[in-house]
Design a protein with these regions (language model features):
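Acidic, Ser/Thr/Pro
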Residues: 1-204
């Protein structure tokens, strides 16, 4: 990455979460190490507990549920927080909430299954306390969903390869948390939950 140097590298273990602080002007690179893995991303403006990345506001900002290179992620205050500058996968989900404990109980009858919401909650411990957490605040990176003719949500097995990545320019000082999704009851992660990596780049 020309004119940038690696500032921090964070490995997010399979079915776990990780968090990092970003500065305006940084670039964040999210890498799927083994392929076919979904990462659920939440973000908050660093100096505010009342402003966070909002999928709903992002949809209306771009007038699309499909985010592409050149599109912006925005906050609940409608400020641009990230800009997508590279993406070699091309499919993501911004409609469905991240998985939580209740989803595994109600859908599959499984108690105490790991979930993206719990992964993100754990990742924030010791990094940032008191942040607003809710499943609908997640962007499901590399998740291959589509909406059918009748409006139904169709979950498809991902097809992206190892080392697939997306890179975003950071536009506001922010805090991010990423869950390497632990969903193993559907083909969401290719039936094999695996690790992800966050690379943070700064200008030289």
């Amino acid at each position: 990455m020309d004119n940038y140097q690696l500032k921090n590298e964070l490995l997010v273990p399979a079915s776990k979460g990780g968090a990092a602080i970003l500065e305006n002007g940084d670039r964040i690179e999210i890498v799927d190490v083994e392929g076919k893995q979904v990462g659920d991303l939440m973000a908050w403006v660093l100096d505010s507990k009342k402003e966070w990345f909002s999928p709903a506001h992002t949809i209306t900002h771009n007038w699309s549920i499909n985010l592409n290179v050149g599109d912006f992620l925005v906050t609940n205050m409608r400020r641009e927080i990230f800009k997508i500058i590279y993406d070699d996968v091309g499919y993501h989900d911004i409609v469905v909430p991240c998985c939580d404990n209740e989803a595994y109980i109600r859908r599959y009858g499984i108690e105490n299954h790991r979930s993206c919401l719990e992964n993100i909650r754990e990742a924030l411990v010791g990094v940032a306390e008191g942040r607003h957490l809710s499943g609908e605040l997640a962007w499901n990176i590399f998740m291959k969903n589509k909406i059918g003719i009748g409006g139904e949500m169709i979950y498809e097995a991902p097809s992206h390869k190892p080392s697939s990545k997306i890179i975003m320019e950071v536009l506001l000082d922010s805090l991010i948390a990423l869950s390497a999704c632990p969903q193993d009851q559907t083909p969401t992660n290719g039936w094999n939950c695996s690790e992800m990596k966050i690379n943070i780049w700064e200008k030289k």
